[in-house]
A protein has these predicted regions:
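C-terminal regulatory/interaction regions
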Residues: 268-271, 315-527
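Metallo-beta-lactamase
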Residues: 107-171, 298-330
């Protein structure tokens, strides 16, 4: 009989994809289990179906969660655990705990609202009722289970485990989690911020570890490293170019951190009279509440330059849904709305009313996951489908990639080098395959003897002091089809252009033959 390793790690999310972060650490036979993060899968509808499927673990086995930060792809399944009867605790930094109150309650409202909208759609008539993944009440229950701990101080998340949180430089309250158990020393990066990021100090961490689990979101990208002043120059140019067209500048934003960074830069430009004095609308109740948390932790932030982002005369925080809808009738404004990947939230109705307007501009300032509506728009789709409606894309589409909260390839590599020696394995997670492979190739070139693991969803690895990780179970083959390109977005794009394509076929008989040919293909595919 093969001896059971003293510690194992199972990847329930963010393996070969950038969302759904969730790692389960289990001590040997009869030992305790903990999770590092428990996040929501985001992006395409196909990928999001994983949130409703099997968790891959029994919540009753989990003694605690160590949470790296408050982004939904790292904490968004915690309310589902609460709905299943789990009670905590959730260990995190104080700013993260403060943010969870709003992040998870909002996530619950989104789940409830999304279920209501789906059940009302005409194309679901006769289908089984769609139930929300969890509710606002479940989200608040998860927040109440938070147990804040200071950075750089050891604590015991569960019997047999010792942990310490290090600054990750990603967003307010973000941390990397150092964990010791069964003689194994492990560091989970969480999300690592870029060097010299606005608001946040640079990432830190220990060295001389058995295992390092490192994110690889931008493992295949190296950005030009620019100063905050240069970034503001770029934003100034985009704002001026958008407003001179006479339309709105619509910016899909992540409610947490990206909104606050943009506000600081916009206010700075306005105070210096570098941009026109137009109204700035933050149309996201969650972003408004997160901004108040930032203000409460202002003494922990850098680069504020005395700006109070929670109270500034040029910034209008939109709370009421009716006020949000009224923004569809205006022009010449800056509208910031969540969600950042355009998969939910008020940004969808702003896109619906502005994508079709040639005078409008949509400016992307954040990562767009494969399959997300934001990625589809960025890749040049002439039409998109939003809430069951076909929308032609006539607006000017722009992108600034200097606001990233993620380290690029060179910064990730530098962070990994600073953790040396890594005596067991470097484990690359939280990335799409191209990013993982590029970062792995770079690190392998620097150290040919380094064990590098690229886990798949559902895989379990045995961990032992000083030894390379050993795969114990293979990944979940039932979910591989959810990864990568999404058929539902292809369908939406196809449906949006179908009528136009048919209209270009000469003659009614020819169009009818084309329709019949499509029907035959569909019938044959069904077997």
């Amino acid at each position: 009989m093969t001896a059971q390793p003293p510690l194992s790690i199972t990847f329930h999310g963010a393996a070969q994809t950038v969302t759904g972060s969730c790692m389960e650490l289990a001590r040997g036979e009869g030992g305790k289990h903990i999770l590092v993060d428990c996040g929501l899968f985001q992006g395409s509808r196909t990928l999001e179906t994983l949130n409703h499927g099997q968790l891959g673990f029994d919540p009753s086995d989990i003694a605690a969660v160590v949470l790296t930060h408050a982004h939904i792809d790292h904490c968004g399944l915690l309310p589902r655990l609460m709905a299943m009867g789990w009670q905590g605790p959730i260990w995190c930094t104080r700013p993260t705990a403060d943010l969870l109150e709003y992040m998870l309650a909002d996530a619950g409202r989104i789940q409830e609202g999304d279920a209501t909208r789906r059940n009302r759609r005409p194309d679901r008539r006769g289908a089984a009722r769609f139930e929300p993944l969890y509710t606002e009440r479940d989200g608040l229950a998860a927040w109440r289970a938070a147990r804040p701990v200071p950075l750089n101080e050891w604590f015991e998340p569960a019997p047999g485990f010792r942990a310490r949180l290090w600054p990750a430089g990603h967003i307010l309250g973000s941390a990397s989690a150092e964990i010791e158990a069964a003689g194994v020393r492990l560091l989970c990066s969480g999300d690592i911020g870029p060097e010299n990021k606005e608001l946040q100090p640079d990432a830190q961490g220990p060295c001389d570890l058995d295992y390092v689990v490192c994110e690889s979101t931008y493992g295949n990208r190296t950005r030009d490293h620019i100063t905050i002043a240069q970034r503001r120059d770029a934003l100034e140019a985009e704002i001026k170019a958008a407003l001179v067209r006479g339309g709105n500048l619509v910016i899909p934003v992540f409610a947490l951190e990206r909104t606050q960074e943009l506000l600081i830069d916009i206010i700075h430009l306005a105070q210096a009279n570098r941009i026109p004095g137009v109204p700035v609308f933050v149309d996201s109740p969650l972003a408004s509440r997160a901004t108040r948390v930032f203000a409460a932790h202002a003494d922990e932030l850098e680069d504020l330059d005395g700006i109070d982002i929670a109270r500034h005369p040029s910034v209008h925080y939109v709370e009421d849904p009716a006020d949000s809808m009224r923004l569809n009738t205006i022009s010449g404004a800056i509208i910031m709305a969540a969600s950042g990947m355009c998969e939910a939230g008020r940004i969808r109705h702003h896109l619906k009313h502005n994508l079709c307007r040639r005078e409008s501009t949509v400016l992307f300032v954040g990562f767009q996951a494969a399959g997300s509506l934001g990625r589809v728009i960025l890749e040049g789709a002439p039409r998109v489908r939003i809430s069951g409606n076909e929308v032609s894309v006539h607006a000017r589409i722009r992108r600034i990639d200097t606001y990233s909260a993620h380290a690029d390839q060179s910064e990730l590599a530098a962070w990994i080098r600073a953790r040396a020696p890594v005596r067991g394995s470097l484990i690359l997670s939280h990335g799409e395959p191209e990013g993982i492979e590029a970062l792995a190739a770079l690190m392998q070139k620097e150290d040919a003897g380094l064990s590098i693991i690229r886990p798949a969803l559902g895989e379990t690895y045995g961990l032992a002091p000083g030894a390379p990780a050993k795969r114990l179970t293979t990944g979940r083959t039932d979910i591989q089809q959810a990864m990568g390109h999404d058929w539902q977005n292809d369908y939406a794009a196809f449906a949006a252009t179908l009528k136009d394509e048919l209209s270009h076929i000469k003659g009614q008989a020819e169009r009818q033959r084309a329709i019949e040919a499509m029907r035959r293909v569909l019938s044959q595919a069904q077997g």
